[in-house]
Design a protein with these regions (language model features):
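Compositionally biased, charged N-terminal/linker segments
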Residues: 1-25, 36-37, 115-128
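Histidine- and/or cysteine-centered catalytic micro-motif in compact active-site loops
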Residues: 14, 34-36, 47-51
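Aromatic- and Lys/Arg-enriched surface recognition patch
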Residues: 41, 47-114, 118
């Protein structure tokens, strides 16, 4: 794991889902530490400083797009937001930010880069 207090995070060859492959330099990003690996959920926000798509492997038809990124941390979370806070939000059509996060993170609990709605980004800003 990475210490959440680090000023810069590097993530190599991360799986992308839910438009995560569209990540670009200058994008705002929220960093969640995997609770499956002992992390605490939302830990930081930052700005994407570098993006490098992972080349596709030859001969494999279906591949999840992967990307390596560098993130410059701009703030540490001041309130907790993790699986225990989100798991009850499972009415997939209610439009709530908590439900969007629960759906995208925990239905397939693997490390990943995801795209989120503007409303969910505003919601997450409230944790800093």
């Amino acid at each position: 794991g990475r210490p959440p207090e680090a000023r810069r995070y590097a993530f190599a060859e991360q799986k992308t889902m839910y438009d995560g492959k569209r990540i670009a330099v200058g994008d705002a990003i929220f960093v969640f530490a995997s609770e499956n690996d002992g992390g605490s959920g939302l830990v930081a926000k930052g700005v994407v400083g570098a993006v490098e798509p992972t080349p596709r492997k030859v001969g494999i038809e279906r591949q999840t797009p992967r990307v390596s990124i560098v993130v410059e941390r701009t703030a540490l979370a001041t309130r907790r937001l993790g699986r225990s806070e989100l798991k009850g939000c499972s009415d997939w059509n209610d439009g709530r930010p908590e439900t969007e996060l629960n759906f995208k993170f925990y239905r397939q609990a693997t490390d990943k880069i995801i795209g989120i709605s503007e409303g969910t980004a505003r919601f997450l800003d409230g944790f800093f």
